[in-house]
């Protein structure tokens, strides 16, 4: 019998183990992608694992833990999204000098418009939006908690629709 990560996630009972598996599922590596038509290249995130499941299955498996993991899961996703946006913006090492939060919104918009839904960034955005929505509807998360959770990355909050 073949187990995939989303199927394995549905079999786990421990929230701590589930959070660790989700962290592994959504781990990525940065690849250098050459530019086209004279543009310079950039770093691009790629999932470390090739899924035999489709994107909806991966998203459903992660979102299914929203009730039990709550803010811990949303925090993991938002921090990962911020790291990827900073990587792509090229300001990872200059966070102290440049307000990278202004670039996060553009990175998210570019991915949503130009990338297929299978993109690493898009899967995490879909998961974060759905989990944030569930937490708000269940009154488990207030706006001030979202801003505390994400820090100064206001554009990330707005772009995810968590305001």
Sequence positions of predicted segments:
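Extended alpha-helical scaffold segments
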Residues: 1-163
């Amino acid at each position: 019998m073949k187990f995939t990560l989303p199927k394995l996630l549905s079999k786990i009972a421990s929230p701590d183990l589930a959070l660790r598996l989700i962290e592994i599922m959504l781990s990525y590596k940065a690849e250098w992608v050459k530019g086209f038509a004279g543009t310079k290249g950039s770093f691009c995130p790629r999932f470390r694992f090739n899924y035999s499941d489709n994107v909806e299955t991966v998203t459903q498996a992660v979102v299914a833990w929203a009730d039990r993991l709550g803010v811990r899961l949303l925090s993991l996703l938002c921090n990962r999204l911020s790291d990827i946006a900073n990587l792509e913006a090229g300001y990872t090492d200059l966070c102290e000098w440049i307000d990278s939060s202004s670039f996060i919104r553009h990175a998210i918009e570019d991915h949503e418009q130009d990338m297929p839904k299978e993109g690493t960034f898009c899967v995490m955005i879909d998961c974060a939006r759905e989990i944030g929505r569930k937490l708000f509807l269940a009154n488990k998360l207030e706006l001030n908690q979202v801003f505390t959770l994400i820090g100064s990355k206001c554009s990330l909050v707005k772009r995810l629709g968590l305001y």
